[in-house]
């Protein structure tokens, strides 16, 4: 509710890349924390920022996690620990599961074994699943009834949306298992780029479909132009995020790695 607080990762998408929507539209106060290297939030640090029952502070009500975060899947052991933690602290638990199916494929489990730990879960039908558009919010009947009202209030109602739903259903029925192909291609990309001395990359950190490349020591604008002239499109500077997906094949990985190597040679 208005004036209450949620705890969230400093680099979480819901905190950093949604135009301040939680504050602007929800009037709720974020308490950001730094992610650990494995994409988790340290529960001791979370406990330390939960506000006391004092009118000087916003009441802490919610903990938000992201899975995957930077391509890393949260372990089930961690999720069990978090579930016990929020129960003890009387907090609700939300998952930004935009790529929850990448996490489930990496962990070799059904997505419901991840989702069951949370009070609410959102996930994308696009991104890895390949639908043209759409996201889903999951939760209790009461939560979804409340969310639908807010969606309408904010102008989110749609007409003749069945064609979008059809694409989403196809993605859920056909495109989950194939996510392992994206993960394999990301590993190939990481291995190839790791052979380039001027780039810094940790192949062991590549669990799903994201490869992060430290390119702070090079001219990224020049690199981007060169790669574009060789049929490879990237964006960003300093830290490059390369994402494999439905439209990327192994031959495309080979093309990309060759283009990167040609630039540095």
Where are the regions that the model predicts?
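Conserved PLP-enzyme active-site core in the AAT-like
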Residues: 1-203, 207-217, 221-248, 256-264
């Amino acid at each position: 509710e208005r004036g209450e607080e949620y705890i969230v990762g400093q680099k979480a998408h819901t905190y950093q890349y949604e135009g301040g929507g939680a504050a602007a539209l929800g009037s709720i106060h974020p308490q950001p924390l730094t992610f650990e290297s494995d994409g988790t939030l340290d529960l001791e640090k979370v406990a330390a920022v939960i506000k006391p029952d004092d009118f000087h502070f916003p009441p802490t009500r919610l903990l938000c996690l992201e899975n995957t975060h930077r391509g890393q899947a949260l372990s089930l052991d961690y999720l069990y620990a978090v579930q016990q933690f929020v129960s003890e602290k009387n907090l609700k638990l939300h998952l930004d599961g935009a790529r929850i199916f990448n996490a489930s494929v990496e962990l070799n489990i059904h997505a419901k074994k991840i989702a069951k730990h949370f009070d609410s879960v959102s996930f994308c039908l696009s991104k890895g699943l390949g639908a043209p558009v759409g996201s889903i919010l999951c939760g209790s009947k009461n939560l979804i009834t409340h969310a639908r009202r807010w969606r309408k209030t904010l102008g989110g109602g749609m007409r003749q949306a069945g064609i979008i739903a059809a694409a989403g259903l196809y993605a859920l029925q056909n495109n989950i298992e194939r996510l392992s192909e994206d993960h394999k291609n990301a590993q190939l990309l990481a291995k190839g780029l790791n052979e380039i001395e001027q780039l810094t990359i940790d192949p062991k950190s590549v669990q799903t479909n994201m490869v992060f490349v430290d390119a702070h020591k090079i001219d990224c604008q020049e690199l981007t132009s060169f790669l574009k002239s060789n049929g490879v499109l990237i964006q960003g500077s300093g830290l490059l995020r390369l994402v494999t997906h439905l439209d990327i094949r192994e031959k495309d990985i080979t093309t990309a790695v060759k283009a990167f190597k040609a630039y540095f040679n």
